[in-house]
Swiss-Prot record:
Its main location: cytoplasm. Belongs to the prokaryotic pantothenate kinase family. It comes from Actinobacillus succinogenes (strain ATCC 55618 / DSM 22257 / CCUG 43843 / 130Z). It is an enzyme of class 2 (transferase). Coiled coil: none annotated. This is Pantothenate kinase. It is found in: Cytoplasm. GO terms for cellular component: cytoplasm. InterPro entries: P-loop_NTPase, PanK, PRK/URK. The gene is coaA. SUPFAM superfamilies: P-loop containing nucleoside triphosphate hydrolases. GO terms for biological process: coenzyme A biosynthetic process. Pfam families: PRK. Keywords: ATP-binding, Coenzyme A biosynthesis, Cytoplasm, Kinase, Nucleotide-binding, Transferase.
Amino acid sequence: MNAKIVNTLNQPPIAGPFLVFNRLQWAELRKSVPLTLTEQDLKPLLGINEELSLDEVSTIYLPLVRLINYYIEENLRRQTVLNRFLGGQHPKVPYIISIAGSVAVGKSTSARILQSLLANWPQARKVDLITTDGFLYPLADLQEKNLLQKKGFPVSYDTPKLIQFLADIKSGKPHVKAPIYSHLTYDIIPNRFNLVNQPDILILEGLNVLQTGNKAKTFVSDFVDFSVYVDADEALLREWYIRRFLKFRQSAFNNPHSYFKHYASLSEQDAINTATNIWDTINGLNLKQNILPTRERANLILHKGADHAVQEVKLRK
């Protein structure tokens, strides 16, 4: 008896709760979605260490935006049903997308690209972007609590304040304040805020947005409708962090207002050694202990290769 051969070339394999796509399989899901970004539009969206192409936007981000819009439309239908059931029109509930992942993986770039693409979708939705950096404790507080070496770890965030911010957003409150963080001064900017005024979509980008924990009853992830984890092998993340540190040494660290201005005078080898030590004792440790364990909680995982291009996409079923 001859066995029947089934062509599964274009079918994604199943890995536990995820469907797994290679670049080609994922790119096919773009369908006819138009690319609204140009090379000129793309440049300001990139991080200091990235050279993302329009091909990457077309291949990876357009299918993702198409998927997210399906989810948003379904969410709007549920809100309509609820309003009908309750017999009135209630404040719209913003759709919250979280972007998680390690330091130096390119979360901020992914968040800015998604913001631009979603805002230029035919429905012309209002899309705001907030980073959780603004909810770090002020530098003086971290120093007083001896937490400077734990900056970026869950303990360094004012999590109740972040949760209250998200609760206000989800309740439809107007003009919700988000504190602003300065990477130059390494601190919260006093009396400066971003105002979030009833967006259709809020993108929340940060290291620990998928974090749960043992003591709290409410988590940041409880307010998130769709979560993305930007992933890469640790050896690559370490390399990217060191490369970024060297670029900052030649640029931002030279600013007299920079918290890290003392690094500007380091030799290249001393700078590499310093960055390696920071990675091994802080960022790499945070990745292993707090960030990486949350990866499987995401709705979608983007796994990057050596050139920052996404090689594999995992989508929760």
